[in-house]
Amino acid sequence: MEIFQAAILGIIEGLTEFLPISSTGHLIVVSDWLGIEQTKQNTAFEVIIQVAAILAIFSHYKEKFSLQHLRLWNNVLIAFLPIAIIGFIFQDTVKAFFTIETVAWFFIIGGLIFLIMEKLYVDGKHRTQDIEDLTMRQAFWIGIIQVFALIPGTSRAGASIVGGVMMGLDRKTAAEFSFLLALPVLMAASGLDLLKHYEDFNNTSWTPLMVGFLMAFLAAWLTIKVFIKFLQTFTFNAFGVYRIVFGIVLLIWFV
């Protein structure tokens, strides 16, 4: 992998991991556009840039890592368990769905869901406005809905945000809980991939790895910061439209 390719993929990972637009879908598409083959070494690279995104969350929410926030992390764990169990059992079945056509259609379906969600969204004090105030019931159902993120093109962030809004969270709180929920999900996925591909790092050039890692961290850190500010003023409609347009482009271009 060339350095400029590593930089682009790092930026794509950082920009899309926490937005409701499917980081996996974008990495598949951009890798194809750049002519990057799915080798074991390149799979190992994707693990590294995902670790960078994880560190960006730690950097943003470091004040949450204390015993006084134990209730919050209990809810994160509850929401994590469904996708952990289902993902582990059906991981081979899920991999069979990784095609451009599947990604494209679920981009479109996800976009329509966001537009419908916003059409039905009613703001107000009845909505949970702080991640510390989530109930175990809300966390559980967010976790159940997040399971749909196993389908390529759905988006983990997208599924958990939709779940949050459906369970009564306001937009900002749904996004923030999605960020924290990404920690155990990404750590589990990255940990498994590291165990599978650790030998492949011996045949990987370290310069592209370092460049990709740095770009992913910076892009993810900035995305989290800007996204939260964005949701204080705007809705998810733009993401719904983007997903539909991107999905249609994929169908025309690749299928």
Swiss-Prot record:
It holds the Pfam family BacA. It catalyses: di-trans,octa-cis-undecaprenyl diphosphate + H2O = di-trans,octa-cis-undecaprenyl phosphate + phosphate + H(+). Its EC number is 3.6.1.27. It is found in: Cell inner membrane. The keyword Transferase does not apply. It is an enzyme of class 3 (hydrolase). One of its GO terms (biological process) is peptidoglycan biosynthetic process. GO terms for molecular function: undecaprenyl-diphosphatase activity. It comes from the Bacteria. Keywords: Antibiotic resistance, Cell inner membrane, Cell membrane, Cell shape, Cell wall biogenesis/degradation, Hydrolase, Membrane, Peptidoglycan synthesis, Transmembrane, Transmembrane helix. One of its GO terms (cellular component) is plasma membrane. PANTHER family: UNDECAPRENYL-DIPHOSPHATASE. Catalyzes the dephosphorylation of undecaprenyl diphosphate (UPP). Confers resistance to bacitracin. This is Undecaprenyl-diphosphatase. It comes from Hydrogenovibrio crunogenus (strain DSM 25203 / XCL-2) (Thiomicrospira crunogena).
